[in-house]
């Protein structure tokens, strides 16, 4: 009877295959680790890690393979990047707005350009006098049949409930003083009868006398007549936080900005970051609005930014909304 022997892989070949698999596994794991660290979903973290590398290092050479030369240059120099979203048809006759994604060294966010100044209004808590819980941003947009919106002024929170029922300071809506006294002096962000953005200290009576049609209280004012009026250290909260701001170009275009924060993809921004972004978009006037947990933007019925709360915007006493029609 023939001797039947089971043929198998030689011990040396088996060891070689095992070593090859191990090496490929290590290389694959290393690749995905490096990609997630330097070009991963946590954008702000990845950019921060990349900027910390020595350009001559082996690790930098690997990390640089995940970007184009222009992208590397922008990240290393902290340049603000602007990417169009749903770019409009150049032949559109009635384009109302344009949304762009912006990124910086520690943040990412969104800039909404509103080309018709008459479309921007202030929405006010209808139960302001009672102090009852205010609507959220999505409620303001939906209830007013608006097409976009951002949070606006500050709110009183004496009880620590955060219900946004009472606005802080002066609020003007449709040319009427809704909140604040006629002799009360506050930092007001307002829109006058000509659709111009006014960012200045004023009393409630002055707001009416100057023709403010829509306005809220917050600050500080960051840019006036193309000049940066905010100086680092003067009232600035020196931490990275979610930010909301409003600005305007000389042609009347309103600039509505939200910058995310308190997350791995966006640590947050300082006032100087707002100034830099606004200047990049040609603002001649700009002011900071309420930020932190309040920072939110809705566009076409959806939140476009990552709010601090997983449930979306907090309850707000006021919001800037973009109407469908004048």
Task: Mark where each language-model region is.
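Zymogen propeptides
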Residues: 2-180
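Short, solvent-exposed aromatic-acidic interface loops
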Residues: 126-131, 203-207, 259-263
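Structural recognition of the beta-strand scaffold that forms the well-ordered cores
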Residues: 113, 147-151, 190, 198, ...
């Amino acid at each position: 009877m023939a001797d039947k022997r089971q043929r198998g892989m030689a011990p040396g070949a088996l060891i070689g295959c095992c070593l090859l698999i191990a090496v490929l596994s290590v290389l694959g794991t290393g690749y995905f680790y490096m990609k997630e660290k330097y070009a991963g979903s946590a954008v702000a973290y990845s950019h921060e890690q990349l900027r910390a590398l020595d350009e001559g290092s082996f690790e930098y050479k690997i990390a640089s393979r995940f970007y184009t030369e222009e992208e590397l240059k922008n990240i290393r120099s902290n340049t603000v990047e602007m990417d169009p979203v749903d770019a409009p048809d150049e032949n559109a006759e009635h384009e109302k707005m344009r949304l762009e994604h912006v990124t910086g060294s520690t943040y990412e966010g969104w800039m909404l350009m509103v080309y018709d100044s008459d479309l921007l209004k202030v929405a006010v808590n209808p139960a302001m006098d009672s102090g009852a819980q205010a609507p959220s941003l999505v409620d303001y947009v939906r209830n007013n049949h608006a097409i976009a919106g951002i949070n606006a002024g500050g709110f009183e929170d004496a009880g620590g409930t955060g219900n946004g029922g009472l606005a802080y300071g002066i609020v003007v809506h449709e040319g009427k003083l809704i909140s604040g006294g006629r002799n009360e002096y506050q930092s007001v962000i307002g829109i006058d009868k000509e659709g111009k953005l006014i960012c200045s200290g004023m009393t409630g009576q002055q707001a009416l006398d100057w023709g403010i049609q829509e306005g809220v209280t917050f600050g500080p004012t960051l840019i006036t007549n193309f000049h940066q009026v905010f100086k680092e250290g003067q009232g600035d909260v020196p931490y990275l936080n979610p930010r909301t701001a409003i600005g305007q170009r000389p042609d009347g275009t309103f600039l509505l900005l939200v910058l995310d924060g308190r997350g791995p993809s966006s640590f947050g921004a300082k006032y100087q970051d707002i100034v830099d972004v606004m200047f990049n978009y040609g603002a001649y006037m700009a002011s900071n609005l309420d930020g932190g947990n309040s920072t939110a933007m809705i566009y076409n019925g959806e939140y476009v930014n990552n709010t601090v709360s997983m449930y979306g915007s907090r309850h707000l006493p006021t919001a800037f909304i973009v109407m469908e029609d004048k």
